[in-house]
Amino acid sequence: MTILSTFTSFSNPPKLNKSSFSSSTGSSLSMGSNSFAWGGGWGGFGGPKGGSFNVDIAGNLIWGVYGFIRGGVGLVKWRGLQKGCKQP
């Protein structure tokens, strides 16, 4: 249940300024969706008894959230580098 509640909070983000929200989360969302695909693959391979449906879902959620966080962290680092380069 904890994973599910975490996922729903990710899939329903708080209302923000649309343009800034879409630009800032675009890369993290795409990375998250890539991780969803990987999670499905690994869930199928590594699941007990050939990978049950529940294991696939858990794999997708865990990898999706992980990818979402990784994308956000990467974006923050990239933004920091951009600001650091703008020196007079």
Swiss-Prot record:
Biased composition (Polar residues): 1-10
Molecular function terms, GO-annotated: unfolded protein binding
UniProt effect for mutating V65A: Decreased ability to suppress aggregation of proteins with long polyglutamine (polyQ) tracts
Residue span of region Pseudo-amyloid region: 40-88
Source species, domain of life: Eukaryota
PTM (free text): Ubiquitinated. Degraded by the proteasome; degradation is stimulated by polyglutamine (polyQ) aggregates.
Name of the protein in question: serine-rich chaperone protein 1
Lineage of the organism: Eukaryota, Amoebozoa, Evosea, Eumycetozoa, Dictyostelia
Gene assigned in the entry: hssl63
